[in-house]
């Protein structure tokens, strides 16, 4: 949900700053399928019977590490992606510190409370580490509506990064066209 909201916020910011949606077509990522693969691994580790397999959390942690490296690789190519890299790195630190699992606040954990852990998630407790970077933020609590989902500070930084990449990409083509017009016009 937060990723969709981030894209929407980025689009609104892009339009508000006179960006154009067709400029998004000029975004060029190297190895975009890596991102799709990491998202597929995340979904499989949470939504399929694989979530009960011990060790699946390590596959997700390796995928997240690959995503951090991928985002860092794009820092000079894609404006704003450093925020995605930063948020993903924060999540990776928490997950690595907790044996491949992201702690979730008990009040936001749902069925996780009865099981203790599912896939790459574990219920936050005194035995989990870096709980202040774990999934303890509920946006429903902030805005008063929406699904009950838990987010980490890293997730929110990633969402801010997605919004920034979207807005800046919408503006990027407009800035290039303006510069070309100034250079190409006779004195």
Positions of the model-derived regions?
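A cytosolic-side transmembrane-helix exit/cap motif
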Residues: 52, 78-84, 101-110
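Actinobacteria-biased recognition of intrinsically disordered, low-complexity terminal regions
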Residues: 1, 175-187
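Extracytosolic (periplasmic/ER-lumenal) interhelical loops and adjacent juxtamembrane/interface segments
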Residues: 104-150
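Lipid-exposed faces of alpha-helical membrane segments in multi-pass integral membrane proteins
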Residues: 9, 37-44, 62-65, 86-93, ...
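Membrane-interface loop-to-helix entry segments
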Residues: 55-62, 150-160
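Structural signal for the C-terminal ends of transmembrane alpha-helices
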Residues: 12-21, 69-78, 164-173
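Interfacial segments of alpha-helical transmembrane regions
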Residues: 66-98
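Transmembrane alpha-helical insertion/packing segments
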Residues: 1-63
């Amino acid at each position: 949900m937060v990723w969709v909201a981030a894209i929407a916020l980025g689009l609104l910011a892009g339009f508000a700053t006179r960006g154009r949606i067709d400029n998004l077509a000029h975004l060029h990522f190297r190895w975009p399928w890596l991102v799709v693969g990491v998202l597929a691994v995340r979904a499989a580790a949470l939504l399929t019977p694989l979530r009960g397999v011990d060790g699946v959390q390590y596959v997700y942690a390796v995928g997240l590490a690959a995503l951090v490296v991928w985002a860092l690789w794009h820092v000079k190519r894609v404006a704003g992606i450093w925020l995605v890299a930063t948020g993903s790195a924060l999540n990776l630190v928490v997950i690595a510190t907790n044996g491949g699992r992201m702690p979730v606040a008990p009040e936001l954990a749902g069925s996780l409370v009865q099981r203790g852990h599912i896939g790459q998630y574990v219920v936050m407790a005194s035995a989990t580490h870096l709980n202040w970077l774990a999934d303890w933020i509920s946006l429903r609590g902030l805005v008063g509506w929406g699904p009950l989902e838990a987010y980490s500070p890293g997730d929110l930084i990633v969402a801010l990064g997605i919004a920034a990449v979207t807005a800046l990409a919408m503006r990027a083509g407009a800035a290039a066209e303006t510069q070309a017009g100034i250079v190409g016009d006779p004195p």
